[in-house]
């Protein structure tokens, strides 16, 4: 009896094992079949040193290129030594394993980059450091990738500081970073130029740059502008009345000209004296700006950058000082140092604030220079320019303009820079202006060749030059400014300041409508056809009425 019971149990056990094996094999086969029908995948991203990744067929023949950063689905059971199978946009491809990343933040595979164009290390718009040409950077990541797989800004480490650098200024090798852009041998022309204590042109950057061209912010083909100082803007209605029956289509309006035109929130945080000394309120300023905008005028916001009495008093460590450490006064004002990146940031913040509050079409930087006539004082140690990065004056000016232009272009706003008429000559001047280094960077270069600023017989002109503004400005534009424009790959629009005030030199000359016409014709006959702006520091209504129809 016991044997029969034991035999029955054995049979049951064998049957149970058999059933388990059948079920197990059935499940395995179903799983296998399911995996063939619907194989397991995981999300990955295409990664590369460059902006493109190659996709292959099963025989490892290249089929197409796709942008770095694109999402794919990796077939987990296909991972091989070199290639893996992925699904992308509903189709199957093979990709090199090294060009697949589990994390989107790791899709940029390059480890080191080199600085082709001297630039700055940024945290937002804050400047952390100046980075010279040829410097090596450790790549830690990026901020964004565009639709073509290109990085906007690389996250890098430099001198133990972490920040971001514009991709346009970086290349893959040390050798490439040391090359100077030499279009048609023009770099050798710059390199041979003399320096007047402002730096060497051969140390500057002349690579082509993308100029502003914004669909939602169209610049007039030719700007014809009146200048409004910080007080005149509050009487915008009167200036509209003056301009309405003329060809005037724009206004240059002070944001800051040593004194702020309105009580800026940026200034309140950084320079309380500037805030307290402001000429008016944001509300009143905005009302007048909107009146101009509603009448169809193109608006240019003017900021005097490195001449700022109140800012220097509030921030003396950022300003030029004498040998005793006291603020140095030049031409009635204190000067923040153009070497100091805190000063750069303050003025850029003012520009960004003005764009947000008032909708300026363009930001114009004036006094983008060091104080003139001070090179002997600097050489003798009488003054301290605060050159913390050991760079030349023109290197500081060019880098500031690159920094500001890059950020303002993100706001779809144009950038212009004012320069002395002397800057069209063939040397780096002592206050840090060199035509090619500035025109190549900004959208508009605005020289100030006021006839009464020239020597009496400049350029061999027999009569006092301010008595014949046509001949003077024709010669200046044709033989100097236009030649400087031809020496760079991406010159700015040349929109020139013209003198709209009477000359008090001997012989005195009234700059009436006829003299305005002579200046304009001289510029345009000499090739400077990008427009003009009237300089009259007091924005005289009577003078503007007199000359409006001559523009």
Please report, for each region that a protein language model flagged, where it lies by residue.
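Aromatic-lined carbohydrate-binding/catalytic grooves of carbohydrate-active enzymes
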Residues: 246-280, 372-380
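SH3/SH3-like beta-barrel superfamily modules
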Residues: 67-96, 132-167
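Catalytic domains of carbohydrate-active enzymes, especially glycoside hydrolases
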Residues: 236-261, 357-362, 444, 523-530
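Boundary regions of SH3-family modules and the immediately adjacent low-complexity/disordered segments
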Residues: 37-42, 87-114, 152, 157-214
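Aromatic-lined carbohydrate-recognition surfaces of secreted/lumenal glycan-active proteins
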Residues: 298-308, 364, 391-430, 489-503, ...
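SH3/SH3-like (including bacterial SH3b) beta-barrel domains
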Residues: 57-68, 119-136
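Active-site-adjacent "subsite" loops/lids of carbohydrate-active enzymes
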Residues: 214-231, 289, 301, 305-353
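Substrate-binding cleft of secreted/luminal carbohydrate-active enzymes
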Residues: 442-456, 466-474, 479-551
């Amino acid at each position: 009896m016991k044997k029969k019971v034991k035999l029955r149990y054995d049979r049951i056990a064998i049957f149970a094992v058999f059933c388990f094996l059948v079920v197990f094999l059935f499940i395995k086969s179903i799983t296998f079949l399911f995996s063939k029908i619907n194989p397991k995948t995981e999300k990955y991203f295409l990664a590369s040193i460059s902006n493109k990744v190659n996709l292959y067929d099963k025989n490892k023949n290249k089929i197409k290129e796709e942008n770095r950063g694109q999402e794919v689905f990796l077939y987990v059971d296909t991972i091989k030594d070199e290639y893996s199978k992925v699904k992308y946009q509903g189709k199957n491809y093979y990709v090199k394993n090294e060009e697949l990343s589990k994390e989107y933040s790791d899709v940029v595979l390059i480890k080191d980059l080199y600085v082709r164009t001297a630039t700055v290390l940024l945290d937002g718009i804050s400047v952390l450091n100046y980075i010279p040409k040829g410097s090596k950077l450790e790549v830690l990541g990026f901020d964004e990738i565009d639709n073509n797989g290109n990085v906007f800004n690389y996250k890098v480490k430099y001198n133990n500081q972490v920040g971001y650098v514009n991709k346009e200024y970086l290349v893959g090798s040390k050798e490439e970073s040391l090359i100077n852009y030499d279009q048609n041998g023009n770099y050798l022309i710059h390199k041979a130029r003399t320096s007047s204590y402002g730096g060497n042109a051969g140390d500057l950057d002349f690579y082509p740059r993308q100029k502003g061209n914004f669909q939602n912010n169209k610049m007039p083909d030719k700007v014809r502008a009146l200048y409004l100082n910080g007080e005149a803007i509050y009487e915008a209605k009167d200036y509209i009345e003056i301009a309405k029956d003329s060809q005037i289509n724009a206004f240059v309006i002070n944001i800051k000209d040593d004194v702020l035109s309105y009580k800026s929130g940026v200034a309140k945080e950084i320079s309380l004296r500037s805030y307290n000394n402001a000429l008016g309120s944001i509300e009143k300023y905005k009302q007048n700006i909107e009146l101009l905008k509603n009448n169809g005028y193109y608006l240019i916001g003017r900021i005097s950058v490195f001449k700022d009495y109140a800012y220097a008093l509030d921030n003396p460590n950022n300003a030029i000082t004498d040998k005793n450490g006291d603020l140095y006064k030049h031409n009635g004002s204190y000067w923040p140092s153009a070497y100091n990146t805190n000063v750069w940031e303050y003025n850029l913040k003012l520009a960004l604030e003005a764009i947000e509050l008032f909708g300026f079409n363009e930001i114009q930087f004036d006094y983008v220079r060091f104080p003139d006539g001070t090179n002997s004082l600097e050489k003798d140690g009488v003054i301290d320019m605060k050159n913390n990065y050991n760079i030349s004056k023109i290197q500081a000016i060019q880098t500031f303009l690159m920094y500001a232009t890059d950020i303002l272009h993100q706001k779809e706003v144009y950038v212009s820079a004012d320069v002395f008429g002397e800057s069209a000559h063939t040397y780096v001047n002592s206050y840090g202006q060199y035509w090619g280094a500035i025109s190549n960077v900004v959208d508009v270069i605005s020289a100030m060749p006021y006839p009464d600023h020239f020597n009496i017989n400049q350029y061999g002109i027999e009569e006092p030059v301010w008595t014949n503004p046509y001949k003077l400005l024709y010669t200046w534009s044709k033989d100097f400014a236009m030649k400087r424009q031809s020496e760079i790959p991406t010159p700015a629009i040349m929109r020139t300041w013209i003198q709209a005030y009477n000359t008090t030199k001997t012989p005195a000359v009234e700059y009436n409508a006829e003299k305005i016409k002579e200046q304009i014709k001289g510029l345009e006959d000499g090739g400077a056809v990008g427009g003009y702006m009237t300089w009259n520091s007091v924005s005289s209504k009577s003078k503007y009425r007199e000359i409006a129809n001559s523009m």
